[in-house]
Structure formats: C-alpha cells, structure tokens
Amino acid sequence: MFMGEYSHTMDAKGRVFIPARFREELGEKFIVTKGLDHCLFVFPQKEWKVIEEKIKALPFTNQDARAFVRLFFAGAAECEQDKQGRVLLPNHLREYAKLDKEVVIVGVGTRVEIWSQELWNNYCNGAQAAYEEIAEKMVDFLL
C-alpha cells in the first residue's frame, strides 16, 4: 500500500526520484498516465491490469465513456526506474501535470500520484478546508 508525501526536485532531463518506500512495490516497470486534478497517476503493472479491465468494461456506446477511455489510455506510458531509482517522465505527461522543478510524490493506497509543488499546495489548501465535510460524505460509501 502506498502512503506518504515526499518532495523531490526533477532534473533538467525530466527525471524524478521515486521514494525508496515505493520502488519495490511499483516494480522495475510501471504505468504512468494522466490523473485527475492535473496530477499523474502511477500504477504498478498488477494494479494497471485491474484498472484496465474495469475501464475496458465501460460502454463504448456512451460518449463520456469513450472520451474517458481515449484520454486515459492515450496519455499512458510504460516507464521504468533506472539504477538510481529515477524515472524519466515523458514530455507530454510533464506538460499535462505542469511539472517544472519541484514535485511532490504522494502515496494514495493502490497508486502513486506525482504533482507539481504549486498545484499540490493549492489542492491541499482547498481540500483541507473542506476535509471534515468530505469525510462525512465518504462515510456513506464505507457503510
């Protein structure tokens, strides 16, 4: 299970360190795709297969489903760690997530998210203000 928040600096080539705690669980190769809220989602191969099957089950006759499937899969890339635990993020994904130099890597249960420091701070400031309200709404899903 992925959890925690780690700040790193992306180098000029677009490489970012994967926290040591995440490296083994992600495996040598993993999938990076466009996430929600302008972050990147990072899935281990095993989890990607689960997500892939669920997404493939969406009805292709539904316009929103087709759009989601296209964007989700078109933005995906198989990436791998180098010997130093870095990953080279494809340019189109760096642009989507507005990644510059300072990045935040967040463990979110079954996936990892990569955020620009600025977008992460903005997101946290907004979500933190509504945390209790959001928690109350989520209780319904757990029961």
Curated annotation (Swiss-Prot):
Short name of one Pfam family: MraZ
GO molecular function terms attached to this record: DNA-binding transcription factor activity; transcription cis-regulatory region binding
Protein localization: Cytoplasm, Nucleoid
Every SpoVT-AbrB domain range: 5-47, 76-119
Alphabetized InterPro entries for the sequence: MraZ (IPR003444), MraZ_C (IPR035644), MraZ_dom (IPR020603), MraZ_N (IPR035642), MraZ_sf (IPR038619), SpoVT-AbrB_dom (IPR007159), SpoVT-AbrB_sf (IPR037914)
GO biological process: one example: negative regulation of DNA-templated transcription initiation
Keywords: Cytoplasm, DNA-binding, Repeat, Transcription, Transcription regulation
GO (cellular component) term, any one: nucleoid
PANTHER family, alphabetized: TRANSCRIPTIONAL REGULATOR MRAZ
Subunit record text: Forms oligomers.
NCBIfam families: division/cell wall cluster transcriptional repressor MraZ (TIGR00242)
Family the entry assigns: Belongs to the MraZ family.
HAMAP family, per the entry: MraZ
Protein name: Transcriptional regulator MraZ
Originating species: Carboxydothermus hydrogenoformans (strain ATCC BAA-161 / DSM 6008 / Z-2901)
Lineage: Bacteria, Bacillati, Bacillota, Clostridia, Thermoanaerobacterales
